[in-house]
Amino acid sequence: MKFDRHRRLRSSKTMRDLVRETHVRKEDLIYPIFVVEQDDIKSEIKSLPGIYQISLNLLHEEIKEAYDLGIRAIMFFGVPNDKDDIGSGAYDHNGVVQEATRISKNLYKDLLIVADTCLCEYTDHGHCGVIDDHTHDVDNDKSLPLLVKTAISQVEAGADIIAPSNMMDGFVAEIREGLDQAGYQNIPIMSYGIKYASSFFGPFRDAADSAPSFGDRKTYQMDPANRLEALRELESDLKEGCDMMIVKPSLSYLDIIRDVKNNTNVPVVAYNVSGEYSMTKAAALNGWIDEEKIVMEQMISMKRAGADLIITYFAKDICRYLDK
């Protein structure tokens, strides 16, 4: 009986490495860091084991560790002391993320800073924009100018990439126009344009103190049941001028990553979100899984689905795995 012998190409590790189709590299990784304004704080986030809220005066230690491991792109999330109803801390020249950006750039000029451009960490109500007094929903068009101000302040501080994440309609177009008018035509936009209203975001909201004080975000983030909607969001953001596209979350949305990859030539970014990280960490800490093997399999799955880059809290761990 004649049959195909697929095992020929699996006969040894060297052979398997030779024909491997998908690879994870340090250059693919973006590392998120939570920064706080108070001094002398390095506080582990209970729902994100191994991830910390870090003071500005201690930030250099975290940046140096990440850089020495081979990480060359980071993303800051600010935890400010004071919040208000319009998120003014987001576009404060001396805001916590702006200061973190300056510190990092003074340490390593070649370290890429990806700026998460949103208001939720800075609003006292925890929503991602200005609240309309009548509808009690986020006012899309009134929120856009504040996003533009935030993006410009982040670039002025040294950010290399703007990543708007509040899912307002038209946010890419408005930010692109604002950056261009301010003389920042060469700053790329990494859009969070495909961001689902996911339950996997829970630990992040603990870390950034950004949970909504009322309602939810389902009027501006996407329904997890929808697939075609992602392509509509992609089409809009490409027309508006985005240079890279984020899919968030990632592991439960690998089909969406593949759809996006099949329908664009811009880099696709998978956000391996807090809930995905925490589930894996919890299982590993209980001895139920082999953390290294599971994490690398998860990263491979995102790359195989079509992701070019991965935002992940596992970034430092992955660098250590790759160094073995």
Curated annotation (Swiss-Prot):
Q: Which PANTHER family match?
A: DELTA-AMINOLEVULINIC ACID DEHYDRATASE
Q: Which PROSITE patterns match?
A: D_ALA_DEHYDRATASE
Among its keywords, does the record have Zinc?
yes
GO BP field: protoporphyrinogen IX biosynthetic process
**What residues bind 5-aminolevulinate 2, as annotated?**
S274, Y313
Question: Where Mg(2+) is bound, by residue?
Answer: E233
What's the name of the protein?
Delta-aminolevulinic acid dehydratase
List the EC numbers from the record.
4.2.1.24
A molecular function (GO) held by this record is: zinc ion binding
Q: Which reaction does it catalyse?
A: 2 5-aminolevulinate = porphobilinogen + 2 H2O + H(+)
| Catalytic site | K195 (schiff-base intermediate with substrate), K248 (schiff-base intermediate with substrate)
- Where does this protein act, in terms of pathway? Porphyrin-containing compound metabolism; protoporphyrin-IX biosynthesis; coproporphyrinogen-III from 5-aminolevulinate: step 1/4
What function is annotated for this protein?
A: Catalyzes an early step in the biosynthesis of tetrapyrroles. Binds two molecules of 5-aminolevulinate per subunit, each at a distinct site, and catalyzes their condensation to form porphobilinogen.
Q: Which family does it belong to?
A: Belongs to the ALAD family.
Q: Which cofactor does it need?
A: Zn(2+)
Organism, scientific name: Staphylococcus epidermidis (strain ATCC 35984 / DSM 28319 / BCRC 17069 / CCUG 31568 / BM 3577 / RP62A)
Q: Name one GO cellular component term.
A: cytosol
Matching entries from CDD domains are given as: ALAD_PBGS (cd00384)
Q: Which Pfam families match?
A: ALAD (PF00490)
Free-text remark on how the cofactor is bound: Binds 1 zinc ion per monomer.
Annotated Zn(2+) binding lies at C118, C120, C128
